[in-house]
Amino acid sequence: FRSFRILFKQMESLYINTPPERIEGGLSFQHGFSTVVAAKHIGQDCRIFQQVTIGFNGTEQPVLEDRVEVSAGAIVIGNVCLHSDCVVGAGAVVVNDVNENTVVVGVPAKPIRLNRE
């Protein structure tokens, strides 16, 4: 097993490039390894899972409103807004705004249903 661990080291990095004054309370990371967050603003009680990228498209950054969930492996890029209570499914690539209370999946991300949590 030792050689396996040497060849396949787990990436344990969590990089946050959002100023603390632009992050509301309650932000949580579930297994935040290999995760990059460079949002313009992060609302209250957002949840971000592992291997997520939230970042620039060269000039603009995403906005996450309140109670947004970004699932494992998702990418949110550029001048987009994830409105309150939306969910981004695992592996989705978000390049457009996501409406309030909406679940999106796929590449590019498309709405599949309302979030009724």
Go through the PLM ranges and name each one.
Residues 1-12, 117:
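Terminal amphipathic alpha-helical/low-complexity segments used for targeting or macromolecular assembly
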Residues 10-112:
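Structural signal for interior beta-strand "rungs" in well-ordered beta-sheet cores
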